[in-house]
Amino acid sequence: MSKIAQLTQILERLDSGEDPVKVKAEAKRFLSSITPQDLAVAEQKLLENGLDPAELQKLCSLHLELLEDQTYRMKMFLPPDHIVAILLGEHETILCFLDDLDFVNQSIQKMDGYKPYRNEFRRLLHIADQLVNAELHHQKEEELLFPQLEKHGLFGPPMVMRDEHTQIRRHKHRLFELANNVSKMDFDDFLTQLDEVVAFLMPMLRDHIFRENNIIYPTALELVDDEQVWTQLKEDCDRIGYCCFRPNN
């Protein structure tokens, strides 16, 4: 049985509801040899075998149980002006904003009413503004990086990421609306809606970033071996622009 066939079989076991810890323990030796590209190809195979794309999206978090974090290794060998290094840097900054959002939300949830002098509301508006402005990050992925995977026949993983971008955008804009309209809202209603948005964004965006760092980006680096392509992607990246983070070059 080929490596991809074995890995597809493992993913099918996860789809059937088996404990990912048990599956990983049973296949530990084999899983130590898989690459992010192997996982991306196996996910594509599941789609070709009839798996609903929505189900693949649910499974992606379980698939991460099979991988070690690739971020540090990529940052070690990529030049700082490489498009993947830039995207990784933007991810780091976005994660910092998520940490701030978590802290600010917890503080606001303890309040008994809107107090405009409290710094938490200014911080919430700043965080929401920065997250909305991170649209340029998604644009670079959707217009530049994902098409490179699709050129090599990998449509499933980028499709899942695009769908998540749509959900993330909707909730980021909702957060921005709440931050701008808190003074006009019933405060209890504001607290409920804020907590719901944060409860969605925090795990969704963190998992999304982890999957891109550990499946999408490493797979793109493995598949695209033409330096001229990466040079052109960097030029296109400059054309689109940057959010939260700018490269040195």
Spell out what each predicted region is:
Residues 1-135, 139-249:
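Small-residue-biased structural context
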